[in-house]
């Protein structure tokens, strides 16, 4: 498709879709709790739909009237063996988190995914879940999907130091630990998004958190809840960057999630000199309205504990850095290599094709700004965040056309992204 180019200004108000991470977890907790859970503002992207379909196949009644998703929870003990393979599509979150649930079930399941998911490492969950007593391995390759998983009702507690900073691995172990008899201890390498921990408490469970240590007991009773999902800051990030780099822009983003483990992009943007203001803060839901204005930006350095707080935003931050004065360094971000694509390689190649001065490193990128971008023909590579990054980059192109292939990947997390983009350009 031909993307919008040469934007003079962006103006408007957007309500971004519900947070993908929270939507997945709300569906899972609703299914493994007793009683009814009602969820408002769920993201209805392809990844979350994979999670919904998986629990339907395991006997959970889930209704969607277009506004509210209602889940009639069955508890861990009420899940039943699916008749077919569990197809997780492109969703690594679905596969890893649901593997933690399945570890405590006595039936055998095979989980499959698309070509992209079939290249993503699963040994990071297979190893600790095997230590707990589940049998899990790749069908054709030990470390990659499809995964065959045989759970057990005799799952053992675990004491485990996470070798990578991964909220998905942590969450898989938490779901497994809830099905043990005894106390588990999970120690993070760096603090990652804590939606699973927050939601356990919302559903009536208990855990103890001290620094990077999480302790929890198995056998807890979880009870259905009413949940409102805030907007996804990872989706809002594209509009934040667009507003900062297109002259005279003024964008208002309503109901954006501001969980402290996810707001790294706000800290980085402020450090770079970006004009971004928070208002209408809701401390219960952890959401706020963000107002973004065009800004003159300075380069920065992003590494260490900051990386897990903005790992999904790094592609669009790389674009932001092409428009900042000076050299931006992104380091300690090797996790980007095992996302939907090798995001280090694909971001660097895509932006280079558009004229950016950007270099890949073993664990990140070096970006020298500021540089004008030019027309090119590009591909999403099956990665929603790459597609949206390119669409924002195209707005800076003054002459010629930007062609994007595989734009359907954007539906993974933001089905009406291109419609919202058109609204901002034509306001």
UniProtKB/Swiss-Prot annotation:
It catalyses: 3-phosphoshikimate + phosphoenolpyruvate = 5-O-(1-carboxyvinyl)-3-phosphoshikimate + phosphate. Pfam families: EPSP_synthase. GO terms for molecular function: 3-phosphoshikimate 1-carboxyvinyltransferase activity. One of its GO terms (cellular component) is cytoplasm. Phosphoenolpyruvate binds at residues 20, 92, 120, 168, 343, 385. SUPFAM superfamilies: EPT/RTPC-like. Pathway: Metabolic intermediate biosynthesis; chorismate biosynthesis; chorismate from D-erythrose 4-phosphate and phosphoenolpyruvate: step 6/7. InterPro entries: Enolpyruvate_Tfrase_dom (IPR001986), Enolpyruvate_Tfrase_sf (IPR036968), EPSP_synthase (IPR006264), EPSP_synthase_CS (IPR023193), RNA3'P_cycl/enolpyr_Trfase_a/b (IPR013792). Its EC number is 2.5.1.19. Catalyzes the transfer of the enolpyruvyl moiety of phosphoenolpyruvate (PEP) to the 5-hydroxyl of shikimate-3-phosphate (S3P) to produce enolpyruvyl shikimate-3-phosphate and inorganic phosphate. Belongs to the EPSP synthase family. HAMAP family: EPSP_synth. This is 3-phosphoshikimate 1-carboxyvinyltransferase. It comes from Streptococcus agalactiae serotype V (strain ATCC BAA-611 / 2603 V/R).
